[in-house]
Amino acid sequence: VRNNPGRCPGLRASALSGRVSLRKFNKKDMTKGFVHSVESFGSVDGPGIRFLIFLQGCPMRCQFCHNPDSWKTGIGEERTADELLDQAERFRAYWGDKGGITVSGGEALLQIDFLLELFEKAKQRGIGTCLDTSAQLFTRKAPFFEKFERLMELTDTVLLDIKHIDDEEHRKLTRHSNANILDCARYLSEIDKPVWIRHVLIPGITDKDEYLVRLRDFLSTLHNIERIEVLPYHTLGVYKYDKLGIDYPLKDVQPPAAERVANANDILQQAL
């Protein structure tokens, strides 16, 4: 999930349904992944300098999403793991000891089989791996959980996006419960996987002290958090909704004041 404007290759309004299935990415198709875009030089999406790979498709419909062009499944540029890694390694000289690749979306876990192949081959090349996810697809049930366990063996750092700590408010904001997202956070703590928490601060929605305190208290129960990032809500992706001819849900919401961002940081950093 980026905090910068992405590209808009074009998305039909019919693509905005919240019904997304992992079945679209079945095993026979896993030699290639559906890629939304790549960026060669990322400095905020994981440790060090990163080559960023944004996979296509997302089950969430976050009201503040600035990349609705990444929602639809089964579209995008089809790339193999080796093609992406060959491209990434052109920039390896910039990575230093901490850099590598970060895979985001959309929601990267929608293409977990391709992601497994990509990270497996990255490790064979000695490339550091980072996963940026909302974890909405997480479950401890088969077959997903066995794949996720293996994925975590291949993942150095997880950037976990927690949209809202309150389940009812989370449903309003994203059309989905946060129960499995919070369970994923617990699981990552259980296996001691390094995690960066990301939380978008939206005036009137996620910036209430009550919710920030609840989020802080939840994060305080985890033992693997390396960083907590408060991302101020912005409107940089509104033009995409205009191009699509659909209403932007938060058109009357302005970015948070600096004081509210500082307040959120003061509260959430107490969890570290």
Model-predicted regions and their roles:
Residues K24-V44, W196, L201-L272:
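Auxiliary Fe-S-binding modules of radical SAM enzymes
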Residues E89-A93, D97-G100, G105, L109-L231, ...:
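Conserved AdoMet/S-adenosylmethionine-binding subsite of the radical SAM
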Residues R2-G10, R19:
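N-terminal basic, low-structured, amphipathic or hydrophobic segments
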